[in-house]
């Protein structure tokens, strides 16, 4: 039986709070867009990250690896995330510098750069001591599919900053008038008696407090929303709201002002014009991934037929297939002048299938940028060829890195500096 402790379809809003009505309207708009991407992302997750949370209902402990017969994409997406992390935000490395801009007078630049260098050193000291490296790897795995979301929150004196990679099934996005992401929803399921721990500044109505008292261990569907406010063009302002969808009540609302105020960082590998969600390298390789998976499945079926065999027999009334046991020492009765059991030759050729697999696996690795230095079993490349291959890789991913610079690196550093 599906494990669903909460309803998926929320009841229409029946209250008289215009804030909640506006919130739910925006949530439904984002949900409508999200529904068009569910099937595409779910298919990609099934073939590349089967252990991740599904976009649809599932049972507790459900096996999701039964469809995987070839692990090239599963391993490849892990390597893609690791290579991207090592190349863009290396662990314990200082992968960015703060320097004075053109608006600073020339005579003040050395002093400003000296101060900014100290700030840079402290920022990366905090990043190195936080959980950034663990969480950004999870986010980069989602990025291989197309879209990733990283939550950057203020911590305590021991851990000044907390990072959390939000699973894509829990996130809904929408574009603003400038065709940039300006609306982010995150769905959470929290026990009623833990709402105050999750949101210490929440304001609870008497009905909510009664629900917490009477049924505190029940799951509450909570949606966090962050919207950009365009009332003041020269200021960066966001509205942060938390709504309990089951009770249809807004328990928290506050305004976030300034650069780096938005705690959610949504970034994409690539996207088509006008679309909200991104398309990652896995999308380009899905045809090869599915073909490879199916080919290996057919090879295994053919191998099973070759090992155990398929047999034919003459229906002469003597042989009873229900009583035949194929094992050493078995005695099988046959009619006079009968051929008895005859092995059926296996169809298909393993060598042809291996040729297909070799090409498909190479395409998958190329799509995930795993073949930049060639195959290890081949002839070692010269330094010139290595340099040329790396130059070609830079041209291939240049546009994607430019997008990551504007959607991930810059907002991340602004958020960290603000905290």
Summary of predicted features, one role per range:
Residues 73, 78-96, 105-113, 257-267, ...:
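Long amphipathic alpha-helical segments
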Residues 32, 299, 340-343:
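Acidic/proline-rich low-complexity IDRs
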Residues 114-117, 121-132, 141-145, 149-152, ...:
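A broad, structural surface signal
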Residues 1-212, 216:
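Extended, helix-rich architectural segments
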Residues 10-16, 20-22, 153-326:
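Structured, contiguous alpha/beta core segments that scaffold functional sites
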Residues 8-12, 96-113, 121-129, 266-289, ...:
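Charged, low-complexity surface segments at secondary-structure and domain boundaries
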């Amino acid at each position: 039986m599906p494990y669903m402790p909460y309803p998926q379809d929320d009841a229409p809003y029946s209250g008289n709070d215009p804030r909640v009505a506006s919130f739910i309207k925006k949530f439904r708009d984002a949900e409508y867009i999200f529904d068009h991407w569910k099937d595409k992302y779910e298919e990609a997750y099934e073939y590349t990250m089967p252990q991740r949370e599904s976009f649809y209902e599932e049972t507790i402990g459900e096996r999701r690896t039964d469809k995987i017969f070839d692990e090239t994409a599963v391993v490849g997406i892990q390597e893609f995330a690791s290579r991207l992390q090592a190349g863009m935000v290396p662990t314990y490395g200082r992968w960015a510098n703060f320097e004075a801009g053109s608006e600073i007078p020339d005579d003040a630049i050395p002093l400003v750069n000296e101060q900014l260098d100290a700030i840079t050193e402290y920022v990366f000291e905090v990043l190195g001591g936080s959980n950034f490296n663990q969480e950004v790897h999870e986010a980069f795995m989602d990025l291989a599919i197309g879209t990733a979301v990283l939550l950057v929150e203020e911590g305590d004196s021991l851990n000044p900053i907390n990072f959390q990679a939000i699973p894509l099934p829990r996130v809904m996005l929408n574009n603003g008038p400038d065709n940039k992401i300006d609306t982010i929803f995150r769905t959470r399921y929290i026990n009623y008696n833990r709402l105050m721990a999750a949101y210490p500044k929440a304001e609870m109505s008497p009905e909510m407090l009664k629900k917490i008292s009477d049924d505190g261990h029940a799951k509450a569907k909570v949606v966090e929303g962050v919207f950009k406010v365009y009332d003041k063009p020269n200021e960066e302002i966001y509205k942060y709201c938390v709504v309990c969808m089951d009770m249809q009540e807004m328990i928290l609302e506050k305004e976030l002002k300034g650069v780096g105020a938005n705690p959610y960082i949504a970034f994409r590998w690539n996207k088509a014009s006008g679309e909200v969600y991104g398309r990652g390298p896995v999308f380009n390789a899905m045809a090869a991934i599915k073909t490879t998976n199916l080919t290996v499945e057919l090879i295994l079926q053919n191998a099973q037929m070759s090992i155990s065999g398929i047999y034919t027999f003459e229906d002469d009334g003597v042989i009873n297939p229900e009583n035949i046991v194929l094992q050493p020492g078995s005695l099988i009765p046959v009619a006079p002048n009968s051929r008895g059991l005859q092995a059926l030759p296996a169809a298909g050729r393993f060598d042809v299938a291996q040729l297909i697999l070799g090409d498909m696996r190479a395409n998958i690795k190329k799509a995930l940028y795993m073949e930049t230095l060639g195959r290890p079993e081949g002839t070692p490349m010269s330094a010139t060829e290595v340099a040329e291959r790396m130059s070609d890789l830079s041209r291939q991913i240049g546009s994607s890195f430019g997008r990551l610079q504007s959607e991930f690196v810059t907002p991340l550093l602004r958020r960290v500096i603000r905290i």
